[in-house]
């Protein structure tokens, strides 16, 4: 299983990155590559096409319905509906919080009675209920954010030994909470947002992690590797790493577009 960072800018596209989007791929025993996209935020669809044909994505998992995590589903709908390649209608499966289908339709501006169903098959996450995608298993975990939000644990075959199972835990957007602890527990890689900064953002809780709180989740969950992401353009990534390093002794990286993590 491997993770490719498509976009990692926090809250809006930055000068060097699209908003949140992460491609997870794994090969099954026959050699077929299965592809899951975690979030498809503002500006991400264009960058995603550097890595994969969007019509070949097996599932898109949305952490929540803020635009920096789902806005480019409107563009994906256009890609699937109007691409001149012909043949049967292209359809991509989407899992997200309750109301995902109506939110996408509203954002696109569908008329009453129109549907995106020929091209986007939308399902609602059920917390704790795994979703199988080839050799991958996705388990949503409810986390703390101002809107309904989920982290996602992705379990799949290790790159160096497919008989061994590994776990990528993606926080989406969250503050410290019991769901975050559940999400991180025993993960090989914790892909954790760190949009806030200790001292600067202390008065605002229930929205985002700091580097320190991401590090605390990694330490508490005995995580193998921490990858910090979702940093807005005005943050200094070095500050997030310094905060996390104060409480977590394992490897720490900062996500960057094109970064590949083999699990």
Residue ranges and their predicted role:
Residues 1-170, 175, 180-182, 241-263:
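Binuclear metal-dependent hydrolase catalytic cores
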Residues 176-261:
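Cap/insert and terminal regions of metallo-dependent hydrolase folds
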């Amino acid at each position: 299983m491997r993770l490719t960072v498509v976009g990692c800018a926090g809250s809006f596209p930055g000068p060097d990155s699209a908003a949140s989007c992460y491609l997870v791929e794994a090969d099954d025993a026959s050699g077929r590559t299965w592809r899951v996209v975690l979030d498809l935020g503002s500006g991400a669809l264009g960058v995603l096409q550097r890595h994969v044909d969007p019509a070949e994505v097996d599932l898109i998992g949305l952490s929540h319905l803020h635009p920096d995590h789902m806005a480019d589903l409107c563009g994906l709908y256009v890609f699937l509906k109007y691409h001149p390649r012909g043949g049967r209608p292209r359809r991509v499966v989407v899992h997200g919080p309750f109301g995902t289908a109506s939110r996408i339709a509203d954002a696109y501006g569908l008329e009453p009675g129109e549907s995106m169903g020929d091209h986007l098959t939308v399902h609602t996450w059920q917390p704790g209920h795994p979703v199988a995608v080839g050799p991958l298993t996705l388990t949503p975990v409810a986390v703390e954010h101002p809107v309904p939000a989920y982290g996602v644990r992705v379990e799949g075959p290790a790159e160096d030994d497919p008989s061994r199972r590994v776990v990528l835990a993606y926080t989406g957007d969250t503050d410290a909470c019991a769901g975050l602890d559940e999400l991180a527990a025993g993960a090989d890689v914790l892909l954790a947002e760190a949009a806030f900064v200790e001292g600067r953002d202390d008065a605002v809780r229930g929205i985002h992690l700091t580097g320190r709180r991401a590090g605390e989740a990694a330490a508490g969950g005995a995580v193998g590797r921490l990858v910090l992401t979702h940093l807005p353009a005005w943050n200094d990534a070095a500050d997030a790493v310094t905060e996390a390093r104060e409480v977590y002794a394992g490897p720490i990286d900062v996500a960057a577009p094109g970064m590949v993590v083999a699990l």
